[in-house]
Amino acid sequence: MMQLDIFDTSGKSVGKQKLEESVFGVKPNKTLLAQYVRVFMANKRQGTSKVKTRAEVSGGGIKPWAQKGTGRARHGSIRSPIWVGGGITHGPLQKDHSLSLPKKMRKAAFISALSLKASGGDLKILEKLDSKKTSKTKDLNAILKNLELVGNILFVMPEKNDKVLKSGKNIKGLNVSLSENLNTFEVLRADKVLFLQEALEKIQKRYKGK
């Protein structure tokens, strides 16, 4: 069974945490992860881009001038796409871009993402957090520095803590998430994932053996 060091807020190792092989030790399925990201990003699209065609743009329906005798080029409508202010040809239309992924595949992708981070040495575990000592941004920043965490950091907590959420917003590259809301995309986009020990245990309990 895999094990990781548990650190306190000063960066000192205070114990070991066992990692479930079925959650953090599977072979990452990179094809599935790519599919998950494609579905996730597609579902983020609003699909509200819309232009007017010649049938929808306002303007006279009559012929702008006679077919012959004016010396001008032939035109049938000022709503034609070749006119300034006319309709748009082949422009974007409102569309539902949403895609779906079966529940089992979503779970498998999540476990693959966690295993990918674990195998790459990109997971760290924090024993506990004193909310009184992390009410300020500098306090939380000091903890990250003690743990030698830089870049895009995902900090996973077991429950909502408004003080940590507030102070975390002021730290560039830090994303604070709850274990119950954690998704595959958040894990993948992070350079390092920091779990509070209780949050890690909740994740393991939920996905163990699945």
Regions found by a protein language model. Give the residues of each.
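Glycine/serine-rich anion-binding loops at beta->alpha junctions
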Residues: 54-90
